[in-house]
From Swiss-Prot:
This is 7-ethoxycoumarin O-deethylase. Disulfide bonds: none annotated. Its EC number is 1.14.-.-. Capable of dealkylating a model xenobiotic compound, 7-ethoxycoumarin. Metabolizes with high efficiency a wide range of xenobiotics, including alkoxycoumarins, alkoxyresorufins, and several herbicides of the class of phenylureas. Catalyzes the double N-dealkylation (oxidative N-demethylation) of phenylureas such as chlortoluron and isoproturon with turnover rates comparable to those reported for physiological substrates and produces non-phytotoxic compounds. Could be used for control of herbicide tolerance and selectivity, as well as soil and groundwater bioremediation. PROSITE patterns: CYTOCHROME_P450. GO terms for biological process: biosynthetic process. It comes from Helianthus tuberosus (Jerusalem artichoke). InterPro entries: Cyt_P450, Cyt_P450_CS, Cyt_P450_E_grp-I, Cyt_P450_sf. The lineage of its organism: Eukaryota, Viridiplantae, Streptophyta, Embryophyta, Tracheophyta.
Length: 490
């Protein structure tokens, strides 16, 4: 049935494209030969960031493709990324909006997908000043420590019964509850039991459906049909999670007291002071963006880090030695400790270099024709920046495919968008606003897992847990989850 749907929709698209007489724009960057109807869709493969990196080695760091009806630009070098994300930032600042995101008109109020406008600037200001500012993060430091302690307690419980820990899932639940406490001052899910399972699952389902290849996105003529039902499915997920947010907002408003000091309080006060600029819809859209974008990044990075360290025991041993020397074996890593743990920080940077959570940064869309390095980029062009390829560029990185944290010991490179050789969170005005939280959470979670346990492979798991195969999605996780047994150090 799926095959028949795909074939029929492609044939319909071909007829419409032929009737409309869509031709190839002039003076595009080089790229592979296109096929009728599908263009270069067949070249994307199961892991597009890897396929695009291979194509860039043939056609160059500024490459054009035709994905169905959509002219596409792929950026695969630090120099080209700097041109797009910094020097011509405004020309490339508009987000491409996937059809599924248009469910409930989410793109009209989303900090991730709004074009640069007054509403977008207001949302960025709220996020930067009240969630991810240094003062806000310092005030919630005790909360992050508590959530890490809960993670370590869970691992200790697993150790008592010699059970394995699904590292990615445990880190995901920790991140989810941290965010819910930051926004609502309460857990929305029990981290390791079934209570609150619905909320956890609906957030996961949104991420899963966001990652599905949607024919509508490459053949917009099919928009009204939604042949795969992806937008309809997303609407169901949005309805559930927005309903939960409605209940929490109404519960707080009934009290008439905004004394928690959390993000919800800040938003409700803004709504009271500026009802024409900020309303219920804005609040719920902001919360949805925060949960979808803010839970996966940390957990995926932790899972890749633990996998790399288990594959390189000498690097894990060196990290453990540093932790024992600086804070003492068996201690929880605090945020203030991280500055005294340079090797741990190098490990985090190296993981983000090799395994950026979103290897293809959220795509941009060119609104008006622009010139780039002598090429003409027409209006409507989709723009991908391949952070995965940039982080593995052999002209920039020695032994570019090797996990070598020591490369950062004498380097001042950071991940905050200033150095275009390393942009796991993007750069420019569209840079991920959650960097300050991610760069605090990852080292304290990873360091605490290393400093409290040794880890062994669970022979009962029916696959190689150290397999490095990637699983495609909006973020890139391991295809085979890391499930390992903790052994307490004291």
């Amino acid at each position: 049935m799926d095959f028949l749907i795909i074939v029929s929709t492609l044939l319909l698209s071909y007829i419409l494209i032929w009737v409309l007489g869509v031709g190839k724009p002039k003076n595009l960057p080089p790229g592979p030969t296109r096929l009728p109807i599908i263009g270069n869709l067949h070249l994307l493969g199961a892991l597009p960031h890897q396929s695009l990196a291979k194509l860039a080695k043939i056609h160059g760091p500024i490459m054009s493709l035709q994905l169905g009806q959509i002219t596409t630009l792929v950026i695969s070098s630090a120099t080209a990324a700097e041109e797009v994300l910094k020097k011509q930032d405004l020309a490339f600042s508009t987000r491409n909006v996937p059809d599924a995101v248009r469910a409930y008109n989410h793109e009209r109020h989303s900090i991730s997908f709004l074009h640069v406008c007054t509403e977008w600037r207001t949302l960025r200001r709220i996020v930067s000043s009240n969630i991810f500012s240094n003062s806000s993060l310092e005030a919630k430091q005790h909360l992050r420590s508590k959530k890490v302690e809960e993670l370590i307690a869970y691992c200790r419980k697993a150790a008592l019964s010699n059970e394995n820990v699904h590292i990615g899932r445990a880190a995901f639940r920790t991140s989810l509850n941290l965010l819910s406490n930051t926004i609502f001052s309460k857990d929305l899910t029990d981290p390791y039991e079934d209570s609150g399972k619905e909320f956890r699952e609906v957030i996961t389902n949104i991420m899963v459906d966001s990652a599905k290849t949607n024919l509508v996105d490459v053949f917009p003529v099919l928009k009204k049909i939604d042949p795969q039902g992806i937008k309809r499915g997303m609407a169901r997920h949005f309805s559930k999670v927005l309903g939960i947010f409605d209940q929490l907002i109404e519960e707080r408003m009934r009290t008439g007291r905004f004394e928690q000091g959390d993000v919800l309080d800040v938003c409700l006060k803004m709504m009271q002071d500026n009802p024409n600029e900020f309303n219920h819809t804005n609040i719920k859209a902001l919360f949805l963006d925060l949960f979808v974008a803010g839970t996966d990044t940390t957990s995926i990075t932790i899972e890749w880090a633990m996998t790399e360290l288990l594959r390189k025991p000498h690097i894990m041993s060196k990290a453990k030695e540093e932790l024992e020397k600086v804070i003492g074996k068996g201690s929880i890593v605090k945020e203030d400790d991280v500055l005294r743990l340079p090797y741990l920080s190098c490990i985090v940077k190296e993981v983000l270099r090799l395994h950026p959570p979103s290897p293809l940064l959220l795509p941009r869309k060119v609104v008006t024709q622009v010139e780039l390095s002598g090429y003409t980029i027409p209006a409507g062009t989709l723009v991908f920046v391949n952070a995965w390829a940039i982080g593995r560029d052999p002209t920039v990185w020695d032994d570019s495919l090797e996990f070598k944290p020591q490369r950062f010991l004498e380097s001042r490179l950071d991940v905050r968008g200033h150095d275009f050789d390393l942009i796991p969170f993007g750069a420019g005005r569209r840079i991920c606003p959650g960097i300050p939280l991610a760069t605090r959470m990852v080292p304290i979670m990873l360091g605490s897992l290393l400093n409290n346990f040794d880890w062994k492979i669970d022979t009962k798991v029916p696959y190689d847990v150290l397999d490095m195969t990637e699983k495609n999605g909006t973020t890139i996780s391991k295809a085979k989850p890391l499930c390992v047994v903790p052994i307490p150090l004291n």
